[in-house]
Every structure is written in C-alpha cells, then in structure tokens.
Amino acid sequence: MQNFYDDNVQDNNVIIDKSTENKIFGKTFFWMFLGLLGSAIIAAYTYYSGLIVDIVVGGSWSVLLIVELAVVIIFSLCFRKLSPTAVGILYFLYSMINGVTLCTVFAVYELNSIVSLFMVSALIFAALGYIGYKTDKDLSSWGTYISIFLIAGLVLSVLNLFIFKSSGLDLILDWIILAVFLGVTIYDTNKIKALENDPSIDTNKVHIYCAMQLYLDFINIFLRILSIFGKRRD
C-alpha cells in the first residue's frame, strides 16, 4: 500500500487561470501515463525474461523494496528543494523499480484477467479524476481521514499477514483499501488546483509531483481490484 500526502497547501478557493490549470492537468496525466507505461513494460519483461527468478533467488527483492521506499521518502520530503530534472529522474526511477516489483502480478494472475481489470481500473480512475477535477468544493479536510484509514489498513494488513492469516479478513481489507483509494483519487485530483495556487511550489515541476500522486493512486486501485476479481493461474 503506497501513498504520501502534503497537506501544506493553500485553500483552493482562490480564482486561478483556467488555461494554466488545464495545462498542468494535461502535463500531470501525460507524466502519469509515461510512468505507468514504463512500469508495465518493465514488469512484463522482468517476468517473461525469467529475470524474476534471478531477483528472488539472488536476494535482491528486499533491496528493491527498500530502495523503492527510499525514493518515495526522498521525493516527498525533498520535493520543494529538488530541481525539476531531479524530480523527474526520481519519478521515473520509482516507476521503473516499481515495475520490477509488480512483475509478480504476471506470476499470480492470468494475462487476460490482468489486461481486462487494468482497463476497468483505468475507466474507474478516469471517472473519479473527472469528479475531482470538476468539484469546486475544497476537499482538503479529507486529508486527515484518508491518512487515518490508510495507516489503519496498513497495520491490519501486516497483522493479518503475520498473525491472523485470515483469507476472509484479507478480502474485507481489499474492499476497504479500494474504497479509500477511490476517495483518495478524487482528493488528489482536486488538490492539483490548490497546489497550483501555492507560491512556494515551482510550476515547472508541480505536474511531476501530481503525476506521482495519481500514479500511486491508480496502482493501488488496480492491485485491489485485481486481488478481488482477478483470475489466478492454476
């Protein structure tokens, strides 16, 4: 379960230039698409080339997860201080590493199921993004509740993995986490307007920050839908 939040943004009731806002939204979704495309290609190559075996047997899996987490932390904590080039490099580095870790999806689920549910996830994500974009209401108050639910979901998932080991609880958690990220997508899309009005953020890189947020939202929605409805390999 992955995401991070920056609630230090100004009230998005400020009137902004719609052409500028639309430009930022366009760049955001373009960068998000590039990240997802890169992750998908890397994931498929890692699995079908057999590289996944070398990674697991060689003990590199835990290292990749640590590096992946480190990149997210650096990205979120140092975003304001980093240059647009550095931010872009971190974003693509994360999407590439995440592509490697996502290769297990191909090992667990049938390809037809992966493709079809990816499309379903994309349609749901697009609808939620549209709602967040068109909503004029300030949704910044959602941030606290989202963080609480995400932390609770993470803790319960870890407890279920090592202690409870309940498939029933696992399914319930999948539904809860999915519901949370559906709300997160609306929240993050709406937050782009507020970020546009934050004078402390470089407009040359804010779209990359937003792309990372939405990338994480989509990946989590897709993984939850795949876990609930995906057809597993025999």
Task: Place the predicted regions along the sequence by residue.
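A hydrophobic alpha-helical transmembrane-helix feature that marks the membrane cores
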Residues: M1-D234
